């Protein structure tokens, strides 16, 4: 599975590999490899941060769009019991209206 991040990394790797110059200094190659690895690690960290933020936002939206567990439990108790304290039609309407 590729995301929009991978083509950038592949481009950096491709440009580095297609170098036709003959380098006699092996330290430069090691530094370049380290730089690419650092960039890839930074991209992975940023990707994880973005995914974490998306998950947090999704959880906020879920909590906004659905009643709390307390309300859910109260509705379940009242619909499952033989209690006449709340009309079952009202409970069904509330349940449907809030998306339970």
From Swiss-Prot:
InterPro entries: Orthopox_B11R. Pfam families: Orthopox_B11R (PF07033). Induction: Expressed in the late phase of the viral replicative cycle. Belongs to the orthopoxvirus OPG197 family. This is Protein OPG197.
């Amino acid at each position: 599975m590729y995301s929009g991040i991978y083509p950038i990394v592949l481009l950096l790797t491709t440009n580095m590999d297609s170098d036709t110059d003959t380098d006699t200094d092996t330290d430069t190659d090691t530094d370049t490899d380290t730089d690419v690895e650092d960039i890839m690690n930074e991209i992975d960290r940023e990707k994880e941060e973005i995914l974490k933020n998306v998950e947090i936002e999704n959880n906020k939206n879920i909590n906004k769009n659905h009643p709390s567990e307390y309300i859910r439990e109260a509705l379940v108790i009242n619909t499952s019991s033989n209690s006449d304290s709340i009309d079952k039609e009202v409970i069904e309407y509330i349940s449907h209206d809030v998306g339970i």
